[in-house]
Design a protein with these regions (language model features):
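Active-site-adjacent structural elements that line small-molecule/cofactor binding pockets in enzymes
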Residues: 1-329
Length: 329
């Protein structure tokens, strides 16, 4: 299994578009935020208070990306309605109200949407944001949504794969192909085209695919939080599969729920898919994830107990500079 490469030997990632290139750099770790940027630990639905103001403040403070969710229904057993707004509509708003920060979706549930609509909406958001879109894609993990759309949950893996291939082909000029979702041809084309020639598509988890398929086709891999040692093995195996597929390296990223404590020296204690800890422990944890081979961490402040504005300022002052200093070494 591959060991994490040093900064001198790490080959660069493909520069698919401006957002992808700014977020994913070899042997470096960038930090983003999951939207909504607010605490809503007491229930599944956020208030979305000051949502745009906080995204713009995140951009000013130097966070590399914000990540939206695709949650078409509020499913009681799931317990999280995400940012409530449709991700593509929301991307249009953010594209017009921000300038530099990457706009990510983690992740679009491909089997629930026709891929022509996904391709059109995503390419539009990419063009409107001047190449800042990063599109995570997934097969979906909420079974209740499928009967609501008269779709078979058991077939989501095949639908995901066909959708992925359809979206890829739609970046071409006047593509002609046969697909389970349709047979584009007869000279028709889809506009606009993605800014970088294709959409950056990051596969989430397994998405009901075998690991080799993901390595052959994904522009990156979104994985779930694990202990650092396990994560290092998982990322190393991902690198090996990508290399075996004859492709240049592809990045890996993960989310992390964080409750940033007032005491900077407070040690880390585990919580749901994340950590409750002080700034010093968070810096150390992020550095360990960088050493494990991860290239981006999306912080989720849903369970953060401190004031959100204060937390953003503290993260920018007490955590991000250490990562930036590490990049300069």
């Amino acid at each position: 299994m591959s060991a994490p490469a040093t900064s001198l030997e790490a080959p660069s990632f493909e520069r698919i578009n401006r957002g992808y290139a700014s977020v994913f750099q070899a042997n470096r770790l960038s930090v983003g935020l999951v939207v909504p940027i607010e605490r809503y630990a007491g229930g599944p639905v956020p208030t979305m208070a000051r949502h745009l103001e906080r995204v713009r403040r995140a951009e000013e403070l130097g966070f590399s990306a914000v990540w939206l969710r695709d949650v078409p229904f509020d499913v009681p057993s799931f317990g999280d309605a995400g940012q409530v707004f449709d991700p593509f509509v929301y991307l249009g708003l953010l594209a017009g109200r921000t300038e530099r920060i990457a706009l990510g979706v983690a992740s679009v549930v491909l089997p629930l949407r026709h891929p022509a609509h996904v391709a059109k909406a995503a390419a539009s958001a990419d063009a409107l944001s001047d190449g800042r879109l990063i599109l995570g894609v997934a097969s979906g993990d909420r079974p209740e949504e499928y009967p609501a759309l008269a779709l078979p949950f058991a077939e989501r893996g095949a639908r995901f794969r066909a959708s992925f291939e359809y979206i890829r082909r739609m970046s071409e000029t006047r593509p002609s192909f046969d697909n389970a979702h349709g047979r584009p041809g007869r000279g028709l084309d889809m506009l606009p085209k993605p800014v970088g020639g294709k959409l950056p598509l990051l596969v989430t988890g397994s998405s009901q695919q075998d690991p080799e398929w993901i390595a052959r086709h994904g522009d990156g891999w979104m994985i779930y939080p694990r202990d650092v040692a396990t994560q290092a093995r998982v990322v190393g195996a991902w690198r090996d599969r990508v290399q075996a597929a004859g492709r240049r390296p592809r990045p890996a990223m993960q989310p992390l729920y964080v409750d940033l404590l007032p005491d900077p020296a407070a040690p880390a204690t585990p919580m749901h898919l994340g950590l409750r800890l002080g700034a010093e422990a968070l810096r150390a944890h992020l550095e360990s994830l960088r050493a494990a081979g991860l290239n981006h961490v999306a912080l989720n402040l849903r369970f953060n107990r401190a004031d959100i504005e204060t937390t953003l300022e503290r993260l920018a002052c007490e955590v991000l500079p250490a990562l930036h200093d590490r990049e300069m070494e």
